[in-house]
Amino acid sequence: MDHYILEMQEITKQFPGVKALDKVDFKARKGEIHALCGENGAGKSTLMKVLSGVYPYGTYQGEILINGQPQKFYTIKDSERAGIAIIYQELALVSELSVAENIFLGNEPLHHHLIDWDKMYIEATKWLKEVGLDVSPGTKIKNLGVGQQQLVEIAKALAKNASILVLDEPTAALTEAEVEILMHILHQLKSKGVTCIYISHKLNEVFAIADNITVLRDGRTIGTVKKDETSQDKIITMMVGRELNRLFPYINHSPGAITLEVRNFSVYNPDNPRKKIVKDVNFYVRKGEVLGIAGLIGSGRTELVTSIYGGYPGKNEGEIWLDGRKIKIKNSEDALSNGIALVPEDRRRQGLVLDMDICKNITLASLKRSYNIMLNESAEIRDAEFFVDKLKIKSPSVEARVGNLSGGNQQKVVLGKALMTNPRVLILDEPTRGIDVGAKYEIYNLINSLVSQGVAIVMVSSELPEILGMSDRILVLCEGRITGEFSREEATEEKIMACATGGK
């Protein structure tokens, strides 16, 4: 008989007007890596908030069992005492405190009612070694990279004797090298009997590390399958409820004349005005073309495209030409007035006002030009509803708060705001980061639609399959310089990575 360390039985969770979870079942064995997959809004986060005590016992129906024993978690502390720890995508660390202080925050070892600093540092060193992190426990969190901070979070969980570790989109901000380190640590934890619940949209990672996969859709359990007995295509079908013909629905484009051209363009570090981040870059994008820009983190991709849009704090130099005419862009208003729009890398911080509704967010960049002095609220609502319908944004109304939407729907609102400006050039910086496969597919189809209408697309992405799957041409940046350019036909992951790392 199978022994399950965790059983969640017929979990139902309702909010006003919405049933977020509908009799969801989820089970995990001791010492397994169990992936939890589903589109944004499928119920994954809600289920984990029930498990962690964020939604306390009594606010949902159903039962949670740990090692066969029913549990009632009224607080997060209750779930932690039962051995459950959750590491969210937004890491919960205090940047000004040391590694040791963060590991034992709220759980400090005491001696005669005072913090036992010696014991804290000795214990912290032990847990850091457990996760393979070679840093001093006295190092401040702000001096660590994101990958190192994530390992501190895992050490913090282990210090609380976690036997069930939940990781929510753990690799969203990690480099490939950091992802490999994380995977190695999770395999080590598995061998020591720790159960890992791995929530991710990146199916290649899921298939690389998981033993079993459970799929949720629309708040229901669709099924649990063994990784070795399924495929990515089958999981995608379970997630979206239909077959996607291809993950990247590329169609042959017929690019026209050059729309945007950048000549001898350099960008300077705002903290060190003499240092160039982007160095004498030249490129162009044609009408009805997707130009992909690849490169490693720190290569200057975001600084380049944000500067072209007028949104980067560091100064720049060089020339920007639009439809054969030299233009000056000092700020985002200049860019928008010239028909250049940007969907930024960080939608929540740079692309949205989370406390405002969908309508206000979509029309925000167009208020001055579209509605003149007097704001026509009915026209504003009508325009917002048009983009909600066009982009298939899932929401009860355009007056819903943007902060309450799923990641995929938030990204569509940012796209709607950009499209509302009727751009000739649309810059997409990490357009599908952190969103589910169904929403990705819809965004790819939108890109195809825009290109067929003659919009020039510049797409920055850290996902090489996305770059290869959707681009007509590909540029590669390394340390601020263009080190490679490929047509769609000649581009490969190996060629791009060689250029991205300074090789040839």
Curated annotation (Swiss-Prot):
TM region(s), chain numbering: none
Entry annotated with the keyword DNA repair: no
Keyword hit for Membrane: yes
Gene3D superfamilies named among the record's database cross-references: P-loop containing nucleotide triphosphate hydrolases
A single cellular component GO annotation: plasma membrane
Pfam families, A to Z: ABC_tran
Domain of life: Bacteria
Membrane association type: Peripheral membrane protein
SMART domains: AAA (SM00382)
Catalysed reaction equations from the record: D-xylose(out) + ATP + H2O = D-xylose(in) + ADP + phosphate + H(+)
Broad class of where this protein is predominantly found: membrane
Keywords: ATP-binding, Cell membrane, Membrane, Nucleotide-binding, Repeat, Sugar transport, Translocase, Transport
Enzyme Commission number(s) of this protein: 7.5.2.10
Assembly: The complex is composed of two ATP-binding proteins (XylG), two transmembrane proteins (XylH) and a solute-binding protein (XylF).
Family: Belongs to the ABC transporter superfamily. Xylose importer (TC 3.A.1.2.4) family.
PANTHER family registered for this protein in UniProt: CARBOHYDRATE TRANSPORT ATP-BINDING PROTEIN MG119-RELATED (PTHR43790), XYLOSE IMPORT ATP-BINDING PROTEIN XYLG (PTHR43790:SF1)
Record protein name field: Xylose import ATP-binding protein XylG
Native species: Moorella thermoacetica (strain ATCC 39073 / JCM 9320)
